[in-house]
């Protein structure tokens, strides 16, 4: 079981990704966090070949590792729950990129919608 403090809970939203109501807990990343992820996703060892696909995959893995704080309803084929961890995010991307691609799409689209709404409210003074 993972415990979340009040600050994390306030900034985190549950995002349903699948028809069975399974999904993830995620938060909006700051521009600084996104910039850091962009730089890290472009950093390679000397023996690695840099490709746009690899940089994109690295960005998405790092984004999910930073934005997610947990998930509900994700199970292995035998029905046992998949434990949440940063390592598991990377491992799942390696073995089931379609699943993680769906999760990334849900998270990025939902959080960009929330961020746009927050920016609109802050410009109009609705949060004052």
Predicted regions and their residues:
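Short, intrinsically disordered N-terminal pre-domain segments
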Residues: 1-12
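Short, surface-exposed, charged amphipathic helix/loop patches that serve as local interaction elements
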Residues: 22-128
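Short acidic-hydrophobic surface loop/beta-edge motif
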Residues: 10-20
């Amino acid at each position: 079981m993972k415990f979340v403090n009040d600050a994390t809970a306030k900034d985190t939203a549950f995002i349903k990704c699948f028809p069975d109501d399974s999904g993830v807990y995620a938060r909006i990343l700051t521009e600084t966090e996104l910039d850091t992820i962009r730089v890290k996703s472009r950093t390679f060892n000397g023996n690695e070949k840099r490709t746009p696909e690899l940089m994109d995959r690295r960005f998405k893995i790092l984004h999910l590792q930073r934005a997610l704080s947990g998930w509900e309803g994700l199970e292995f084929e035998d029905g046992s729950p998949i434990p949440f961890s940063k390592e598991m995010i990377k491992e799942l991307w390696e073995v089931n990129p379609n699943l993680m691609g769906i999760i990334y799409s849900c998270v990025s689209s939902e959080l960009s919608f929330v961020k746009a709404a927050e920016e609109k409210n802050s410009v109009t003074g609705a949060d004052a």
